[in-house]
Amino acid sequence: DVYKRQFLFRLNMTGLTQPLVDLLENPAVIKVGLSLKDDFMMLHKRAPFEQHSCIELQEYVRMFGIQDKSLQKIYGILFGEKISKSQRLSNWEAEHLTEPQKQYAATDAWACLNIYNRLQELKVTGDYELEPDEPLTNQESLITNP
């Protein structure tokens, strides 16, 4: 089950291996994330590859009237819950990551996947309304139908 298993790749230690390049280039595997442009810019410095089937959530959420670009805010709008980002600025180059760092990395990936899946559900059900005449704010960006 994709929700129960996450993998943390320490690219600073392993480099960008061929199996990871194959995954990034595989059009059958959807890659979902936030600020992917920055991630791919860093990955391209490690090895040449052509990524396929990537969903940039900062752009994708706009189709649903969400203007916010932070993972915390997007997650809060869709699920009414808060996720912790306290480990974001910690030392990711350390030889050993702390448990909170590992939890942060897993939560970050899990939240992106949940956001994407929720938006896919809304796309299918049409259970949202856009109000283009009014400026969109954090909690008003996505209004679900009763």
Predicted features along the sequence, with ranges:
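Short alpha-helix plus adjacent loop in nuclease-associated cores
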Residues: 55-77, 101
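Intrinsic disorder
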Residues: 140-141
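Acidic, Mg2+-coordinating catalytic module of metal-dependent nucleases/exonucleases
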Residues: 76-136
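Acidic beta-strand-to-loop metal/phosphate-binding motif
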Residues: 29-36
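Short active-site loop/helix that positions an aromatic residue
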Residues: 39-46
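Short, basic/hydrophobic alpha-helical segments
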Residues: 14-28
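A short alpha->loop->secondary-structure connector
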Residues: 47-55
